[in-house]
Amino acid sequence: MSTIIDVYAREVLDSRGNPTVEVEVYTESGAFGRAIVPSGASTGEHEAVELRDGDKSRYLGKGVMNAVNNVNEAIAPEIVGFDVTDQAGIDRAMIELDGTPNKGKLGANAILGVSMAVAHAAADFVGLPLYRYLGGFNAKQLPTPMMNIINGGSHADNNVDFQEFMILPVGAPTFKESIRMGAEVFHALKAVLHDKGLNTAVGDEGGFAPNLGSNREALEVIIEAIEKAGYKAGENVFLGMDVASSEFYNKETGKYDLAGEGRTGLTSAEMVDFYEELCKDFPIISIEDGLDENDWDGHKLLTERIGDKVQLVGDDLFVTNTQKLAEGIEKGISNSILIKVNQIGTLTETFEAIEMAKRAGYTAVVSHRSGETEDATIADIAVATNAGQIKTGSMSRTDRIAKYNQLLRIEDELGEIAVYDGIKSFYNIKR
């Protein structure tokens, strides 16, 4: 047993230059843990509350000193004296201290920072890497990376409606080789865009952010890059999209407006038709948030039409929340959940969501946020839970590469027992 003797939070910066919460946990044994909380740009309305100060004279209102003070003045006195390995007990104590259904009193960013830092300190105490401490002896599966190489929507200042266009190097024999394949396609895409006279600046998640004629054109240039890198689309490398359709859903009309394509007033059925057409023309294996988070009828139709052959990921739809996920499972909506630790606010609840998804035959994709830091906790979570997939950005920006590098270290440490399933990680669709 190692008792927590101090918890301290401070305000630091994320990859967008916005403040976020960093937490440190100290124990009587000398074990120590530190974690930094990520932040999203396109957020679901049902997510746990990220507490911002709202003081426009400081960081344009985005300061997090209220959350920092909640850690130092409210949470710290509550959990000092706890055994650092009592993760569930500590998380439960913070949830009860907050007392709201969405962590709106203390802030999910305050609670999560402590939850993750506690896990790091506990792993340090028992002398295990974080993935092994959290996942036990069976933690050995490296995730298939979903690499966001073209950014649009809320993640870029361009005219592309869909938020992310991803490559999935499912044909690689190991995680290390999947990273190599992804990097080669990324560099090939830069050359393709350059040759077309298009911008090669990158967006929030490290992908290129050119102005393109349509969402279809984004897929076309990625196919060209895959082939230029010497791979076969639909064999070595598949495509994925995070549509983030809530960002262009018109609540007043109940329709979808693809402004970048000049197509407005699309119904849910017309959006489903569009996705089905794209999936016939391109090797798309995963679509995230294809309809608005509250358009459950649209999600149901999409699942019925292509859910047997395409992974349909619920992000804003489920917000890493077991109640939302249970409802989706009961109604047969989507077949996968995106896992974002700050959507729910504790590691315990995060692990519960992953477990529920797997029991129901849904896949689970561990994910970063657009506002990230050097913290690589999600890499360890992906291996600890044998999630099978991770979405953590492109092949540029250190805040993204930090997660890939941590996974490379883990694979190296696991040695011969490391598993990389590639295409088999999409176990609930026909491929």
From Swiss-Prot:
<keyword id="KW-0963">Cytoplasm</keyword>
<feature type="binding site">
    <location>
        <position position="288"/>
    </location>
    <ligand>
        <name>Mg(2+)</name>
    </ligand>
</feature>
<keyword id="KW-0460">Magnesium</keyword>
<dbReference type="GO" id="GO:0004634">
    <property type="term" value="F:phosphopyruvate hydratase activity"/>
</dbReference>
<dbReference type="GO" id="GO:0000015">
    <property type="term" value="C:phosphopyruvate hydratase complex"/>
</dbReference>
<keyword id="KW-0479">Metal-binding</keyword>
<keyword id="KW-0964">Secreted</keyword>
<dbReference type="InterPro" id="IPR020811">
    <property type="entry name" value="Enolase_N"/>
</dbReference>
<dbReference type="InterPro" id="IPR000941">
    <property type="entry name" value="Enolase"/>
</dbReference>
<feature type="binding site">
    <location>
        <position position="340"/>
    </location>
    <ligand>
        <name>(2R)-2-phosphoglycerate</name>
    </ligand>
</feature>
<feature type="binding site">
    <location>
        <position position="370"/>
    </location>
    <ligand>
        <name>(2R)-2-phosphoglycerate</name>
    </ligand>
</feature>
<feature type="binding site">
    <location>
        <position position="369"/>
    </location>
    <ligand>
        <name>(2R)-2-phosphoglycerate</name>
    </ligand>
</feature>
<feature type="binding site">
    <location>
        <position position="315"/>
    </location>
    <ligand>
        <name>Mg(2+)</name>
    </ligand>
</feature>
<feature type="active site" description="Proton donor">
    <location>
        <position position="205"/>
    </location>
</feature>
<dbReference type="Pfam" id="PF03952">
    <property type="entry name" value="Enolase_N"/>
</dbReference>
<feature type="binding site">
    <location>
        <position position="242"/>
    </location>
    <ligand>
        <name>Mg(2+)</name>
    </ligand>
</feature>
<comment type="pathway">
    <text>Carbohydrate degradation; glycolysis; pyruvate from D-glyceraldehyde 3-phosphate: step 4/5.</text>
</comment>
<dbReference type="GO" id="GO:0005576">
    <property type="term" value="C:extracellular region"/>
</dbReference>
<dbReference type="GO" id="GO:0006096">
    <property type="term" value="P:glycolytic process"/>
</dbReference>
<dbReference type="InterPro" id="IPR020810">
    <property type="entry name" value="Enolase_C"/>
</dbReference>
<dbReference type="Pfam" id="PF00113">
    <property type="entry name" value="Enolase_C"/>
</dbReference>
<keyword id="KW-0324">Glycolysis</keyword>
<dbReference type="InterPro" id="IPR029017">
    <property type="entry name" value="Enolase-like_N"/>
</dbReference>
<dbReference type="InterPro" id="IPR020809">
    <property type="entry name" value="Enolase_CS"/>
</dbReference>
<feature type="active site" description="Proton acceptor">
    <location>
        <position position="340"/>
    </location>
</feature>
<comment type="similarity">
    <text>Belongs to the enolase family.</text>
</comment>
<feature type="binding site">
    <location>
        <position position="391"/>
    </location>
    <ligand>
        <name>(2R)-2-phosphoglycerate</name>
    </ligand>
</feature>
<feature type="binding site">
    <location>
        <position position="163"/>
    </location>
    <ligand>
        <name>(2R)-2-phosphoglycerate</name>
    </ligand>
</feature>
<keyword id="KW-0456">Lyase</keyword>
<dbReference type="InterPro" id="IPR036849">
    <property type="entry name" value="Enolase-like_C_sf"/>
</dbReference>
<protein>
    <recommendedName>
        <fullName>Enolase</fullName>
        <ecNumber>4.2.1.11</ecNumber>
    </recommendedName>
</protein>
<dbReference type="GO" id="GO:0000287">
    <property type="term" value="F:magnesium ion binding"/>
</dbReference>
<comment type="function">
    <text>Catalyzes the reversible conversion of 2-phosphoglycerate (2-PG) into phosphoenolpyruvate (PEP). It is essential for the degradation of carbohydrates via glycolysis.</text>
</comment>
<dbReference type="GO" id="GO:0009986">
    <property type="term" value="C:cell surface"/>
</dbReference>
